[in-house]
Amino acid sequence: MQNNKVQSSDADVTFQSSDNVDFRLHKRYLEFATGGFPPANTPSSLGEIVRLSESSTTLDILFQFVYPQRHPSLDKLGFEELLKVAEAAEKYEVFGALTATHLMLRCVSKFLHSHSKQVLQFACVHRVAPLVERLAPIMMDTPLSKIKSALILCPSYFVEWVSTLDH
């Protein structure tokens, strides 16, 4: 179900999801709430549609973080949905969504335990140190051979990880 704010009739930019759902947004809000979209005064063709690779479900949640309103609750999202929103937040630098998804990944115990390798991969790819720190004690018994592909993405995390395991 799409939020009315991301379907504004007076919007000046249209994004289309991978499943062909259009999202009409205001450039001025994108400019202030993100780092991954051009400034509001950037010229664009009338009626231009910007195609994005994410699904409408992911974009609907993500774009709600762009507007000056109460942000959506992520509590009911499953791990895969949350990770998709987190990846999109990183890609488009949607600041509110970055904070919310990082917090959910760091604080929801069931995700940390049941999807620890995926969370570690995300944390290393996007350089989210608090997530790596949170995972270290949880994954203490995981052989380094099983997680080195994630840790190698950021050597400084690898050093910290090994130091944590020594204590």
Each PLM stretch: what is its role?
Residues 90-93, 127:
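Ankyrin-repeat interhelical turn detector
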Residues 77-90, 100:
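Fungal eukaryote-biased detector of long internal structured cores
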Residues 1-74:
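BTB/POZ (also called T1 in voltage-gated K+ channels) oligomerization domain detector
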Residues 43-46, 77-80, 109-117:
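Alpha-helical oligomerization/assembly modules used to build nucleoprotein complexes
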Residues 82, 97-98, 131-132:
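Solenoid-repeat scaffolds in large eukaryotic assemblies
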Residues 101-167:
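Acidic, serine/threonine- and proline-rich low-complexity regulatory tracts
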